Regions:
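Active-site donor-binding acidic/aromatic loop of nucleotide-activated sugar
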Residues: 230, 238-241, 252-261, 267
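Acidic anion/phosphate-binding donor-loop and adjacent secondary structure
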Residues: 65-69, 154-158, 169-190, 195, ...
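Short hydrophobic beta-strand element within catalytic cores of glycosyltransferases
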Residues: 296-301, 306
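N-terminal strand-loop element at the rim of the active site
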Residues: 6-14, 18-73, 77, 237-239, ...
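A conserved mid-protein helix/loop that constitutes part of the nucleotide-sugar donor-binding site
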Residues: 14-22, 197, 201-220, 237-243
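A charged, aromatic-enriched C-terminal amphipathic alpha-helix characteristic of glycosyltransferases
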Residues: 15, 337-369
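Aromatic "clamp/platform" in nucleotide-sugar-dependent glycosyltransferases that forms part
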Residues: 93, 260, 279
Length: 369
């Protein structure tokens, strides 16, 4: 059995965390084991399930919290366990911190994978500077260069490393996300939404995801359709700001902050539209899960990669059109039916986003020398 040390799990059950869990559920765990390096001493998302699937988790102090402790604990971990791992796989949205790869090289791990999950800087200006600096040197420390999309590859790589880039699809378990009418009815009944138009968004409450604009769009839509609600599933730094803005717009009774939810299938099933006005994305797992559920999706044009579109009831729309135009498009999209699961399953397989077929490809890449 080969063991791979994986970095990318945090306390927040976001897109990268879902991506890693999906693949670990479906690789042949008799051939390969994932161990997870977590830069927090708190439990990370899905940790109990990962452990139940045979993974190990190693917790160290984050560099941001204490750089000296981070460096010491990282070296101690590799000194103790480095000989067990045939590869290190680093899943990140920025190259600001490449110490994991440097340390892996120092301890003789031959296969060192960097995997890009974003297409723009989501962090501070300083981390943006560090990203562009490390972009020049990443070829010195990594041996394999992966990305979730062509845009994400260009954000991380240049020249020779870009030519070597391999696109790894953010494949999902399509059956696990399929529309469930019983779960739809249960959630809508529990919240008193039986006769309401439910517009939803799933993701980290963060500048990148542009939920503030979603509130502006919903304000326009709600004026014309008062029997509607906007639901945010997720948590993040912007939650208080968004809650205050909803109040200022007079929408407190019509905007729901559902927090972290583990049955995403049920929440997607309760939606009539998935509203996704992100400012930038790598290749959104949330948008893929929404399409597996069949719910109509309205997403940012020129921001979210074209390859995200699987279903016919997925529409791109330019953010520059403004909230009123988005509101009219929202009204149009809510009149469109869900896609049938048979068609969805076939399209996901054809485009390489069905985890049942993609997990074997990833396993082969991880095990290749």
């Amino acid at each position: 059995m080969q063991k791979v040390l994986v970095f990318g799990m945090t306390e927040n059950p976001g897109g990268v965390e879902s991506f890693l869990l999906n693949y670990y559920r479906h690789v042949n765990r008799e051939n390969i084991q994932f161990d997870f390096l977590c830069n927090t001493h708190q439990k990370v998302a899905y940790e109990d399930e990962l452990l139940s699937l045979g993974a190990h988790t190693f917790h160290i102090t984050s560099r941001r919290q204490n750089p000296a402790a981070f460096k010491r604990e990282l070296n101690e971990l590799f000194a103790l366990h480095g000989g067990e791992w045939s590869a290190v796989w680093v899943n990140v949205s920025s190259l600001a911190n490449i110490e994991y790869l440097k340390t892996a090289k120092q301890y003789g791990i031959k296969k060192r994978i960097i995997h890009s999950h974003s297409s723009q800087n989501m962090d501070s200006r300083l981390r943006g500077v560090l990203h562009h600096l490390n972009k020049r040197f990443i070829g010195k420390y990594a041996t394999d260069f992966w990305a979730c999309s062509e845009d994400a590859a260009r954000w991380f790589y240049t020249g020779k490393t870009l030519k070597k880039a391999v696109i790894i699809h953010n494949a999902i378990d399509v059956e696990r996300m399929a529309f469930d009418p019983a779960k739809r009815d249960a959630i809508r009944k529990a919240h008193g939404w039986e006769n309401k138009h439910v517009i939803g968004n799933v993701g980290r409450l963060h500048f990148e995801k542009n939920q503030s604009f979603a509130l502006d769009v919903f304000k326009c839509y709600h004026t014309e359709h008062p029997n509607s609600v906007l639901v945010f599933v997720g948590q993040g730094e912007d939650e208080q700001m968004l809650s205050e803005k909803a109040g200022a717009l007079g929408l407190s009774d019509s905007v729901v902050f559902a927090g972290v939810q583990h049955d995403i299938q049920a929440w997607l099933s309760s939606f009539d539209l998935f509203l996704f006005p992100s400012r930038f994305e790598g290749l959104s797992v949330s948008a893929m899960e929404a399409q597996a559920n069949g719910v109509p999706v309205l997403a940012s044009k020129g921001v979210i990669p074209d390859e995200v579109k699987i279903n016919e009831n997925f529409a791109f729309f330019d953010l520059d059109r403004g909230e009123e135009a988005w509101s009219h498009k929202t009204e149009e999209m809510t009149r469109i039916d869900r896609e049938s699961f048979t068609v969805i399953k076939r399209r996901f397989q054809e485009k390489g986003f069905d985890i049942q077929t993609e997990a074997g490809k990833l396993e082969a890449l991880l095990c290749a020398q």
